[in-house]
Amino acid sequence: MNTSPRKLNLDEWDGRYEQLRRDGLREPGYGGPLRRHVVREKDFRLQQLQFDSSPAALRLWNFLLTENERLQRARANGDKIVGTMKDLGTVPVMAYALPGVRAFYPDGAWWTPCLMECSDKLLQQAEAMGIDASFCPVRAMLPAFETGEHFPKPDLLVCSTGAVCDDFSAIAQRLEHLGHSIFWWEIPRRRQPAAGETGCALPGDLAAPKIQVDCVRAELLRVGQALGELAGKTLDDGRLAAGIRAANQARRLLDTLRRTVYSAPAAPLPALEMLVAEMLAIHFCSDREETVAVLEDLLAEVQSRVRQNQFVIGTDAVRIFWVNPVADLRAMNLLEELGGRICGSDYMFTHALDLIPENLPPLEALACTALADPMVGPTADRAARIVRECQAGRAEAVVVSRIPGASHCAREGEIILEIVRREIGIPAIELEIPPVCDAMLATLGSRLQALVEIARAGRTK
């Protein structure tokens, strides 16, 4: 059997798995063949995807797709379950600083219609509950709470408000109206310090007035008190500092993985696995220690491939910077099929990739990190970081994937594209990708193919 790095469909992974087993594959308790997720969980979309062929990628996918089992097992063992919504990376750091607490994002249900190819009927159920297709696919979260089939009911539900997208805010309020108690905390819209106003440096080369940092710190103090009451332990500075250091361990690994993959002469790991790996930073897929182990495996695989000049995408592939997560994972495969490769990304949570400052009081450090969220500040700030990372990654083109119905996507894509074109002059497009994009594959393919060809033609000028 060919063991060089490559992409495999699900049928090919069946054979690959049996070969790995014969060769002595050692797996964690959640391991097993990928196909079982189709049979048991009805994750039919896996049958349409291409996967990396490494045992490290197998571990990554099994880790992602067994989160509900992990949460159910944690509850059975007496752990407290915290549902955190919208902040994408801040509250989980606090939750995991306490013993016996697990955090997850109910927002993650937005990928369920994709994975189950809408057989779950979550989007239709959301529409029956008054949240129709004019809202972001995160509306799938609403019926998921009601059915209890996709994640356990949290012991504590925490949601950020203030500088959040309108459709998510409306969905969360509807959720509370249905009887799900929510602990709200507020984050203001980030702005630059005014003349003469004391400012604070934030991760990601950003800044905010000290008054905003103080405001968020006070809100996170309230969150910490609620988490402590749930756990029966005080979330003091010592615990919080240790939690920050542990979170930064995962973030450092991910940073090294991203730099190694995106700077390599060709792609040593496919775009789809990189997207999933980056998602782990948000809440550690409900297991912080295992997230570190999964990332260590991926990094070791990638470093080995780079040393041996083994890649899954050829050196001629056009270097693409991708903005926003895709509602349909199939789109990441499609880009590579058409001659592109990812050389950089902004999947809406860059603040969850940046290191949390360890030289500040813990709550202040987390407040600064929360305010660095690209979605709570001006789009121009986000675009400036995209431009810097495009230049660092030698991007030849930019794709902004618009999320259907998402209120934050109404104008931000246009603004980002305008700034990218003005500052670095590379081709850039905006695409809307629905949860299942099969009906649009031809159109999406044509637009991506044109972008790749234009970028490739630009090499000869």
Task: Give names to the regions the model predicted.
Residues 377-424:
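C-terminal hydrophobic structural anchor segments
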Residues 76-78, 87-89, 96-126, 322-387, ...:
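Redox- and metal-dependent alpha/beta enzyme cores, enriched for Fe-S-associated oxidoreductases
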Residues 61-150, 155-156, 163, 167-172:
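An N-terminal, globular interaction/scaffold subdomain
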Residues 151-238, 242, 246-256:
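Internal, well-ordered alpha/beta segment that forms a basic, Gly-enriched binding/recognition surface
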